[in-house]
Amino acid sequence: MKKKIISFALGIALLISSLSATTVYAAGEIEVVDSTSYTVQTFPVDTTDITEPLRLALDYCSLNSSENNILTIKIPAGVYCITKTNIASSNTVLDLTEGATILNDCPGRGNIINSPSGYYGYDGLKNFTVRGGDLGYTDENANESTLSRIAHANGVRFENVKFTNGFISHFVEVAGSTNVVFDGCVFDGFIGDLSSSSCEAIQIDILEEYEHFSGFPYYDATMNSNVTVQNCTFTNIVSGVGTKSLFHGYYQNNITIKNNTFTNLTGTAIYCSGYTNCDISGNTITNCAEGINYFMMKSDSRLGSVCDIDNNGTINNNCGTKIYNNTISVNATDEISTASAIYVFGNNVTSSKQNKYDSYAKVGNYSVKNIQIFNNTINTTAHGIRVYDTVNSKIHNNTVTSSKSSGGYGIYAANSSNSNQIYSNKINKFSNGILIASSSKSNKVTKNTVNGTGNSGIVINSGCDSNSIDSNTVMSSGKNGILIGASKTSSVQSNNISSSKADAIHLNSKANVNVIKGNLFNVHGKYAIYCDKGSTANVYVNNYKNSSGRYGYSKGDKKDYKFANLAVPTVTVSKKGTTATVSWKKVGGANDYYVYRSTSKNGTYSYIGHTKSTKFQNKKLKKGKTYYYKVSAVKVANGIKQRSNLSTVKGKKI
């Protein structure tokens, strides 16, 4: 191997004239080796400015490499600078593992290495890897320039590269590319804050000409796909991975962000805008202002910044994303006071919103559909998991803990978040544990454990209909265990509620609950069930045994009353002709009786009528047919229907 010898005196002179006091380089040469490690070409390096020899090496690879002849450019150990952007070549490895550091010293908005421009689709740079070494900036470079920009590429990898000392810019930008991987890289140090920059270290961006990704034609609506960021470390920067930019109706697809570590970020660790089929898993996020943001459309105030590409985009109906097995610790800051560990956002863009914010976003509901959030461990000073306009999704098996019992929500579903399953989560402290708000309907809240909230454990706000709260454990709430606002709630069943300082279950005025049944009450400050004036409910049998008052309470316009369980009627059935007479003894406290019938003993029983007496006649039955009956004792007062369990089945053949 050919070596270029530089005298000691010349080396000293070069160090004094060309380098800062902390910069050194090793004289030698850039080698280009083939897949057998045979050196096929060399380019001398005799100055700290490596721009020209690296360009020559890349040009050589551009002419001589192929899919069957991968060439590797090996940079010798040392600290070098780049003063003009170099263009990467396909089927090439840039190897910095011998200890090379390359610093961006471009006088303008230049970069260390970019993909070539002037391509469509993914037909530009192919099969290019940067391996090892350090990439950063000289102390004098304050040009807010990215270190590397990749577009229209297929098969680009950054392996074990350390990126350092950013200045109000991304470290790497990727747009309109596929099969891009960042593996084992480190991103450390950044000058700037949220007031001057929200830059992600790795920006997985849109290919938009004027504001976001200039200089990389052709702008053909090519979106990123199959981008992976794994095993990387992000420390002491603003934001980690993602983008805040999006086109209406176009989506970045198959984005994987896994097994990374984010520490001491003043912004958001992972920020996804318009991403579909994402795998966000196994990440450790510590002492960051926000954890994971997932936006299908921007919020109202930011609709004006939605970008336009053409009129061919369509609204996504299945985001297909999973956020799981992440460990997240977030601390709210002055800039992000409503910080969330996980924040999911869809938006229904109406014509009035479109006009008001002069937005390119097409009119339509950009809801988040089919996202799964599970097995995450969260500690936060603000919110745990917040979802807006999120539909047909699952939030389950998360452990969500607040450092305080005032302010913030453990799990919050709002803005028409409908038909979601929220189950098997463990929630500690917060103001409210689980809150359903803003016209969110048909959600199932089941088998969650909520402990130590400052206000209520589980809350259904006014206007949120057809939600069910079943089989949850709610402990030590500062106010109510379960609070129902002015909404039509399907059921509150089989919950274990203990040590609420106010009521176990509290119904506000105009609340309407179809079923309150099978709940276990233990030691409450006031009532097991409190029904405010104007509320309505069907209250079946509950376990009041260990409740402080051992009863419920109904507030009325003229009279209040207490209630507990009604006894079950003992039923007999007789017949005369085609009439069956169902009879029972009076049940104490009941003022009405509901009768149900089936033509099969173990079949479905349908309501056939009610009576205030102790006898009910069922007429005009078919001869030779057997009819089966059940009866429930009922007390109706102040809009509350207190019901006993159904009686034992009794039948009669006509």
Place the predicted regions along the sequence by residue:
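Acidic Gly/Asp/Thr-rich repetitive segments characteristic of extracellular carbohydrate-active
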Residues: T39-K74
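Short, T/G/N/S-enriched strand-turn elements that build extracellular solenoid repeat scaffolds
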Residues: R55-L63, C81-S89, D105, G118-Y120, ...
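N-terminal extracellular ligand-recognition/capping segment immediately after the signal peptide
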Residues: L58, E67-P116, L135, D139, ...
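Short glycine/acidic-rich loop motifs that flank beta-strands on beta-rich extracellular proteins
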Residues: I82-T85, L103-G110, L135-L147, F167-E173, ...
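Right-handed parallel beta-helix
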Residues: Y122-L125, T129-A269, N277
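Consensus "Asn ladder" position of solenoid repeat domains
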Residues: G133, V161, C185, C232, ...
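Pro/Thr/Ser/Gly-rich low-complexity, intrinsically disordered linker/stalk tracts
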Residues: F563-G589, K623, I640-I654
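Beta-strand-rich modules
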Residues: N618-G639
